Structures are given as structure tokens and as C-alpha cells.
Amino acid sequence: MSTDDNSNNNSSIMVDASDLSMMQLSDSFFPTGMYSMSNGLEAIFYSGKKMKTEELRELIATLLQYQIGPADCTALGNAYEHASKFNLPELLEVDRAIFSMKLVQEIRDASIRSGTQLVRCIRSFSDNRILRQYDDAIRNGAAFGPYPVALAVAANAFLIPKRKAALIMLYSFSVSIVGAALRLGMLQHFDGQKVIDQLKPQILNVIKENISRPLEGMWQFAPSIDITQISHERMNSKMFIT
């Protein structure tokens, strides 16, 4: 399509503040620490294993399919629905459920740190009621503040649709691991972008499968990855928080 055609159709393109908010929350500049996590990749690197680009893609795909999708994405979907209805008690139930499902302490602590930081940052410039109530619950010890729930509350406050909120989470998660691989010297920038591009269909499919899953159907099962993440937890010196 020509430049003239594009300019003639500008009036039909609907862009609003929620699109900018989506970019804001997914940006590495936003202070959640999401891009300082390797999710166990650093432990693999220091074990001496040589990982090919395709193996890295398969690792992220496994994490999306068996951990982040059925657990975090499910929690986000349920939390978003409760936040949109200002239902704090049900929101806190999701908070407790996803907290209890994160078996590795380092992963659990990182999720809480990111989620709490996200809520408090947004509260500093937003007076959304359910966001304020959730932040108060975290401060009072009635909630933990795991990232999927915090992101759902933040997305609701910014009028970001539920599925786009899930995109933020899965994209940030995938990029954090690719970024860790780059910083560890495991692959080059062009290869990293190729991996992200190859993951797009799976990210969309994982959201489709899990965003409307009921809370009682939430699950995760990736024992070998859990073991790797535990080994990172026990490392004395590390570059990444997970």
C-alpha cells in the first residue's frame, strides 16, 4: 500500500490512551524488574551446558506452555474479571492461589517484588479504586501482590483489555529470558529477535487456551525446570534475580 493510501486511511485507525499504557507497562523502563530475571537460564549457563538458539526457543516455549500459561495467565484472567467488578475478596482469592502455586521461593519472591512495585508505582499517579484497595491489602498483609494479579489490576485501571494485558505479561516474560541469554553471551541480537518472532504464534495460543480458564482449573507442571530454578536459588554469585 502506498504512502498516500496510508495517509487517507488514518481517520479509520483507532488508537487511544490504553494503547500507550500497554506500551508503558511492557517497556523495560517501567520499574518492575521483569527484565532482570533469567528464570533459571543463568543456572543452565553456569552448569556448562552449551545451548543452541533452537534449544533456547524450546525452553521458553516449555515455560509458556506448562508454567506461565496455565498458572500466571489463568491468574491474570481471573484477577482482571474481579478487578473490573471491584470485587476485592475474589481478587484476594486469586492472589493467594497463584502465590501458593509458585513452588520455588526465588521465583515466588521475584513475582511479589515485581507485582508490589508495579502497583505502588501506578498508585503514585492513579487513584483507581480497586488498585488503591489492592495496594492497601498488600501493605496490610492481606495480599501478597504476585505479578500476574498486580498486572491485571493495573491493566484494568488503564482500561487495557484483558487479552492485551496477557500479551504484556507473556511478551515481557519471553523477552526477559532472551535478554538474559544475550547478556550471558549465549546468542546474538539478531538470533534473539528471531526467537521472539518464532514464539509469537505460541504466545497467542497460550493466551487463547488460558485467559478464560476458571481459577479451579489453574495448574503448572514442569519439574525439571523447577529443579533448575532451585539450583539458581542456591548459587552464591549471580547476575539475575531468578
What are these regions (language model features)?
Residues 1-22:
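Charged, compositionally biased N-terminal leader segments and the immediate start
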Residues 22-31, 60-66, 100-107, 135-141, ...:
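A short glycine/serine-rich beta->alpha loop
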Residues 49, 169-242:
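C-terminal auxiliary extensions adjacent to catalytic cores
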Residues 73, 78, 85-156:
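Internal, conserved structured core segments that host functional sites
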Residues 22-86:
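Glycine/small-residue-rich interface belts in oligomeric ring/scaffold proteins
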